Design a protein with these regions (language model features):
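Active-site activation/catalytic loop segments of kinase-like enzymes and analogous catalytic loops
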Residues: 83, 263-286
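Conserved kinase catalytic-core helix
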Residues: 87-91, 131-178, 223
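Active-site catalytic-loop/activation-segment of kinase and kinase-like phosphoryl-transfer enzymes
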Residues: 159-221
């Protein structure tokens, strides 16, 4: 992946490349993400941003998965995320009512959209800070986080997600249309195929592999018919980071749209369970 972020920003912002420093961000599976730092800070008022900033985050979305270039991946994912960042920004004119949760829970953050270059497939958003760590890494770090910090963050996250699901439950077709949100159904289908194909590879040689993978396919199709809501869809531990102020930051809204309450809670719960077992604090008899 050799997209030239420096040249792109230099042309867009009309500043010399020497004022831009690019730092690759780790963890991206489907997109390439970088932090661009500016000396001096760059003026973004022409994009509706109220102030100059020392840094921004950019995401480039090629028509394939960045970590597996041989796997095609619809670039509509970036259009979905760009629209989601507007809908979830409580200061946006197009904000959804549920965006008020970011005001109600000020310790829960999400990036704000600065600019979306549809032709170049580049998304520019606010930087939530360089001193961030994913929630799974934060929970197992040494020395461990203070119990009161863990309790506060867990409470804020649980209440925020619970209220988000309730506030967006059973979204109507009319509402989804009014959101002007690209449909995430195609991406979900691609994701299901990717999971099933990987499962077949992992289970090669296992008896009844076709029966097992068919059950996974059926479950992926059927569960979305129940408990519908709006959601991140891809809600897991790597999409939740903790910054230096111990705020929760929710990242990667590229699947945002019609979802399922059980999926939203179950996927995240599964990853927290894996974190729990990785701590080696339970015995096989417990």
């Amino acid at each position: 992946m050799d997209f030239d972020f420096t040249t792109h920003l230099s042309k867009l912002l009309s500043i010399p490349p020497s004022q831009i420093t690019i730092q690759a961000l780790t963890g991206g599976l489907s997109n390439a993400a970088v932090r661009a730092s500016f000396i001096p800070p760059v003026d973004l008022t022409r994009f509706g941003h109220p102030q100059s900033v020392p840094s921004v985050v950019l995401k480039y979305s090629p028509p394939y998965m960045v970590n597996e270039p041989s796997v095609p991946y619809d670039t509509i994912r970036q259009d979905i995320e760009a629209r989601a960042l507007v809908l979830l920004d409580p200061n946006s004119k197009s904000a959804l009512p549920v965006s008020s949760l970011f005001t109600k829970y000020p310790n829960v953050k999400s990036p704000c959209l600065i600019h979306h270059d549809y032709e170049e497939r580049v998304l520019i958003m606010t930087d939530l800070g360089s001193s961030v760590v994913t929630i799974d890494e934060w929970l197992i770090q040494e020395p461990p986080p203070l119990p009161e910090d863990v309790g506060r963050i867990a409470t804020d996250l649980g209440r925020f997600l619970g209220e988000f699901v309730i506030a967006t439950s059973k979204p109507s077709v009319e509402l989804l249309s009014l959101l002007q949100l690209p449909s995430n159904s195609g991406l979900l289908h691609q994701f299901d195929e990717y999971v099933v194909n990987n499962l077949k590879d992992v289970l090669q040689g296992v008896p009844d592999v076709d029966v097992l993978t068919k059950r996974v396919e059926d479950a992926a199709r059927d569960f979305r018919k129940r408990d519908s809501c709006l959601g991140m869809v891809d809600l897991w531990s790597k999409n939740i980071v903790i910054n230096s102020d111990k705020n929760l930051c929710l990242l990667d809204w590229e699947y945002f749209g019609w979802s399922n309450a059980s999926w939203e809670m179950g996927l995240l719960g599964m990853f927290f369970l894996l974190i729990y077992f990785s701590l080696d604090i339970v015995t096989p008899h417990e």
